[in-house]
């Protein structure tokens, strides 16, 4: 689960969120690293893919559509700059690459925050008009308990046998 962002081959500055910011690597986590933010979101989605993937796809589509719609204008502006001053064209595309990378990072981080609130503890928090519902006294509204798919439950019983069977 990722977002395709424009990166130009002339770019001479790696977006901070794509770098080893805060020493981030495969065993050093950083909240400022795209690698770790995208993996954080993915790892929240995997166990309840059927419930959560719609939120991920909506965010992914929104970002990619925005980037795709801007592409023609960005490349036209870059081509005009290239004719006059190649260094300015390179700086323009470098800045655009960095901006889109940071935008995707920021959006994905907010998506992760949204997912953890909406799906925390195996429930689904109710929403209305894009906001989490509150009851008459301002507290979070009730939740939906979707349970698990029938196939999962059958496989669970198959693997555990009578281990969790309630005594008669």
Regions found by a protein language model. Give the residues of each.
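C-terminus-biased signal that marks the final domain/tail of proteins
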Residues: 1-168
């Amino acid at each position: 689960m990722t977002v395709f962002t424009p990166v130009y081959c002339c770019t001479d500055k790696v977006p901070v969120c794509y770098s080893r910011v805060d020493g981030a690597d495969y065993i050093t986590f950083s909240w400022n690293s795209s690698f770790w933010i995208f993996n954080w979101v993915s790892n929240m989605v995997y166990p309840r893919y059927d419930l959560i993937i719609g939120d991920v796809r909506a965010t992914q589509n929104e970002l990619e559509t925005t980037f795709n719609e801007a592409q023609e204008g960005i490349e036209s502006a870059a081509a005009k700059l290239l004719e006059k001053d190649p260094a300015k064209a390179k700086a323009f595309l470098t800045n655009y690459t960095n901006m889109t990378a940071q935008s995707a990072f920021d959006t994905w981080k907010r998506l992760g925050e949204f997912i953890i609130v909406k799906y925390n503890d195996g429930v689904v928090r109710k929403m209305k008009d894009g906001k989490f519902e509150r009851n008459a006294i301002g507290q979070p509204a009730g939740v939906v308990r979707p349970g698990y798919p029938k196939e999962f439950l059958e496989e669970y019983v198959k693997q555990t046998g009578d281990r969790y069977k309630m005594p008669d």
